[in-house]
Amino acid sequence: MEPVASNIQVLLQAAEFLERREREAEHGYASLCPHHSPGTVCRRRKAPLQAPGALNSGRHVHNELEKRRRAQLKRCLEQLRQQMPLGVDHTRYTTLSLLRGARMHIQKLEEQEQQAQRLKEKLRSRQQSLQQQLEQLQGLLGVRERDRLRADSLDSSGLSSERFDSDQEDLEVDVESLVFGTETELLQSFSAGQEHSYSHSTGTWL
């Protein structure tokens, strides 16, 4: 933006100079030399005498160059007017007023750019802070998830050991009942055998 502002400043100076020259031409007086003291009047150097044909040719070339320069300046001013905000009325404008308005518009754009840059820095700082908070929360969630998995693993291990103990107790009960049942059956069969032998021996004796 700075080169544009400097260019506008140069155009402002040129426009002021042109308008001053036009006013001087309208009123028919010469301006003071800008580089001399206020009391001195500019004196134009006398041009060397030239042939009429060469003078007319040089004047024609000068006029053509001046026309081209003015046409180019007019196109540039028209493009500049189109770049101005729509709310500003430049339907009837002078070169100086248009350039001043353009300079004010550029200054306003520079202020808006600075505000946008400050807002951008603020948002970047806020984003970094939120990113750090997110990483901290993810770390806490990871720790809690590991603790939950560890607790579930311990609970499942406890249930497995309880089931194993219960199965062992049931197995011991079944073994005891099997052992006791076998002893009872043996005693019953042994008693039945003795009675049978007693009856057989009694019959023999008789």
Curated annotation (Swiss-Prot):
Keywords: DNA-binding, Nucleus, Repressor, Transcription, Transcription regulation
Bridged cysteine pairs (disulfide): none
Highest taxon of the lineage: Eukaryota
Region Interaction with SIN3A and SIN3B: start-end pairs: 8-25
Quaternary context: Efficient DNA binding requires dimerization with another bHLH protein. Binds DNA as a heterodimer with MAX. Interacts with SIN3A AND SIN3B. Interacts with RNF17.
Functional summary from the UniProt entry: Transcriptional repressor. Binds with MAX to form a sequence-specific DNA-binding protein complex which recognizes the core sequence 5'-CAC[GA]TG-3'. Antagonizes MYC transcriptional activity by competing for MAX and suppresses MYC dependent cell transformation.
Protein name (Swiss-Prot/TrEMBL): Max dimerization protein 3
Species this protein is from: Rattus norvegicus
